[in-house]
């Protein structure tokens, strides 16, 4: 792979029409790094989307074999560039190599998962109601329904996952698997990593002689680049992972279009952890160790980080708090992703103090000292403590802080714990730590939790999100705009497909998945029964 160019990747072309230049910043030194990148021009965004539109019919009807081979070859191509990718991503994010290696391996695995999904083919949810003339009531026509790709998709990469939620990340791969060309808006925090990944995609598309519009990458620090993408009339859906503020701004633009489009956004979540009393009446060392690991992985820059721990105050919880503080002093530290994240982290933690009347218990506050414009010292884990009564008195103004921080909320009894958790906004996860004897109590609260959270965790922590068939990564607002879908796991493909029904169609005009002979041998629901059988003509 050649060295970085700072160019946009528009189909098979490298483009440099933008005027404003910028550079990535080292997470370790704060120094700008080569090369200069350009903010994509409106013309470059338009060209990328038009190429995607032109490739749409081909990719929508391409065989499962073509799509799966593309995904598998891309995994091989990215893996061959592993060393260069890891080196650049570490400089741009500050993540240590083991953390990045794990993320890259996960992303390569995800490509294989979706290749398998496409090959098997049943994800299209084919449903057939055969013609019924001899039944009570009017005759029923032949109805055949399946999921079809929506068309070109715009995807916004995230700051905290340079591989897994980026150019080859979950939104992009699930859109490709659904049959949608993709235009990626790279995150300005790691533009070099984005370009290196984009060149891998470009190489595979060229080597397999596929339409160039299946993929383009536009980059920039200016809001206008993303705004041009979401407002382009040929974009049919958006995938976004980022802040609530940024997501709301882009969502508003999609709804102001002459034809509003779906905006699938993963925004933010408090991820409360509820610790029932029995937890503290036994050895809490594993609970403490695993909580800290969940809080500090990626330096707390995870959308599933457990931001609040609720418990009933007693002598045992006082002892546990001291145990937690001792363990926190040994927690690993690393830089935050960039100065913007650091600034927002400082602002959010200050809001905890002001809006929730929370008291910082780790690290102990010291007199402010002058700092340089770039402070390369990693922020330590921040722990705050507050009572439920104080939070309720302050109006329960819940705010997410993106970084290594957790609020310990002490409740006078279980009734107060239930009262305060009922004020929580929608979220990605809720975790419950309890003894088997407390299952009856948990059952009484469960319906409240399922109404607000996408994934409910029993005696575990929420940071790990497996790429599975049952995975749910999404939840009611403000975790997502549409809590009915998931952005991780095989079901993520359904966001970029919509149902189409064919009534009384001749066999020759039906997609293979709906033809009576079932040439792709997929599972289908026929007259209410799952089967892979052929149907009589």
Name each model feature, range by range.
Residues 1-141:
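N-terminal Rossmann-like NAD(P)+-binding subdomain of aldehyde/semialdehyde dehydrogenases
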Residues 5, 289, 311-428:
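NAD(P)-dependent aldehyde/semialdehyde dehydrogenase
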Residues 34-39, 55-61, 135-136, 154-155, ...:
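Short, well-ordered beta-strand elements within core beta-sheets of diverse protein domains
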Residues 56, 60, 75-82, 86-89, ...:
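Structural signal for hydrophobic packing residues in well-ordered secondary-structure cores
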Residues 70, 178-193, 214, 259-277, ...:
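Short loop-to-beta-strand entry elements in the cores of soluble alpha/beta enzymes
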Residues 122-292, 310, 314-317, 535-536:
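Rossmann-like NAD(P) dinucleotide-binding subdomain of oxidoreductase/dehydrogenase enzymes
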Residues 373-377, 414-510:
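C-terminal core of ALDH-fold dehydrogenases
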């Amino acid at each position: 792979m050649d060295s970085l160019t700072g160019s946009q990747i528009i189909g098979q072309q490298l483009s440099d029409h933008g005027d404003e230049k910028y550079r990535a910043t080292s997470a370790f030194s704060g120094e700008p790094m080569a090369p200069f990148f350009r903010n994509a021009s409106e013309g470059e965004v338009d060209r990328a989307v038009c190429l995607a539109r032109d490739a749409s019919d081909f990719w929508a009807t391409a065989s499962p074999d073509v799509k799966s081979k593309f995904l598998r070859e891309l995994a091989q191509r990215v893996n061959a560039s592993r060393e260069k990718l890891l080196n650049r991503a570490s400089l741009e994010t500050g993540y240590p190599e083991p953390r990045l290696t794990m993320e890259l391996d996960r992303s390569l695995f995800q490509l294989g998962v979706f290749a398998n999904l496409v090959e098997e083919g049943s994800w299209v949810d084919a449903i057939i109601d055969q013609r019924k003339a001899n039944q009570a009531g009017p005759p029923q026509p032949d109805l055949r329904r399946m999921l079809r790709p929506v068309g070109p998709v715009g995807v916004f990469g995230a700051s905290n996952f340079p591989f897994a939620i980026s150019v080859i990340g979950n939104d992009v791969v699930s859109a490709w698997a659904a049959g949608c060309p993709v235009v990626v808006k790279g995150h300005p925090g790691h533009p070099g990593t984005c370009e290196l990944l984009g060149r891998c995609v470009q190489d595979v598309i060229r080597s397999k002689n596929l339409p160039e519009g299946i993929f383009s990458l536009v980059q920039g620090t200016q809001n206008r680049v993303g705004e041009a993408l979401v407002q382009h009339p040929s974009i049919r859906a958006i995938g976004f992972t980022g802040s609530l503020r940024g997501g709301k701004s882009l969502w508003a633009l999609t709804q102001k279009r002459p034809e509003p489009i779906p905006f699938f956004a993963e925004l933010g979540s408090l991820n409360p952890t509820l610790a029932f009393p029995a937890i503290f009446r036994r050895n809490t060392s594993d609970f403490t160790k695993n909580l800290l690991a969940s809080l500090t992985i990626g330096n707390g820059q995870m959308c599933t980080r457990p931001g609040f721990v609720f418990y009933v105050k007693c002598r045992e919880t006082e002892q546990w708090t001291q145990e937690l503080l001792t363990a926190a002093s040994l927690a690993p530290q690393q830089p935050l992703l960039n100065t913007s994240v650091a600034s927002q982290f400082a602002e959010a933690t200050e809001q905890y103090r002001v809006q929730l009347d929370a008291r910082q218990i780790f690290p102990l506050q010291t007199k402010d000292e002058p700092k340089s414009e770039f402070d390369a010292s990693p922020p330590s884990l921040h722990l705050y403590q507050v009572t439920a009564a104080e939070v309720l008195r302050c109006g329960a103004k819940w705010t997410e802080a993106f970084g290594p921080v957790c609020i310990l909320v002490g409740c006078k009894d279980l009734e107060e714990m239930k009262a305060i958790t009922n004020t929580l906004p929608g979220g990605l996860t809720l975790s419950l730590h309890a003894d088997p004897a407390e299952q009856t109590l948990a059952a009484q609260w469960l319906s409240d939790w399922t109404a607000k959270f996408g994934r409910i965790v029993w005696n575990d922590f929420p940071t790990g999100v497996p790429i599975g068939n049952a995975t749910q990564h999404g939840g009611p607002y403000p975790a997502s705009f549409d809590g009915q879908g998931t952005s991780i796991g095989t079901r993520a493909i359904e966001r970029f497909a919509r149902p189409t029904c064919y009534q009384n169609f001749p066999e020759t005009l039906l997609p293979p998945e709906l033809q009576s002979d079932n040439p792709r041998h997929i599972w289908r629901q026929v007259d209410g029964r799952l089967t892979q059988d052929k149907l009589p003509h």
